[in-house]
Amino acid sequence: MKKYFVVSLVKNGILGGGIVADQEAITYHTGKVTVPREYRQLVMKYDEISDATEGWLFILPTVLVKMKNGKEYKFVVFFSRKRLINTISAHGFHP
């Protein structure tokens, strides 16, 4: 079953979009044409995630997703940050 999260990617500003979580990966997507192509449909497979931690950007709740290849993606999560962490944990990664 897919789960949906309202998020913004923090990369050279705050880029609105959403995350869809399914059985294989979490996928950030946005329809904004000003966002570089590599971030418009960003697939993060659970087995490639090395860490996921909660944090803050000023007053906004965030989740930092670290990949095994060294890349990091910070997301402002507007609702249910804990549910996003739990979704990642349920698929193999445990913070």
Regions found by a protein language model. Name each.
Residues 93-94:
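Glycine-rich, low-complexity intrinsically disordered segments
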Residues 7-8, 31, 49, 76-82:
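Generic signature of intrinsically disordered, low-complexity segments enriched in small/polar residues
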Residues 1-24, 41-42, 83-90:
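Anionic N-terminal interaction surfaces
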Residues 67-85:
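Canonical phosphoinositide-binding patch of PH/PH-like domains
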Residues 13-14, 23-66:
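Phosphoinositide-binding peripheral membrane targeting modules
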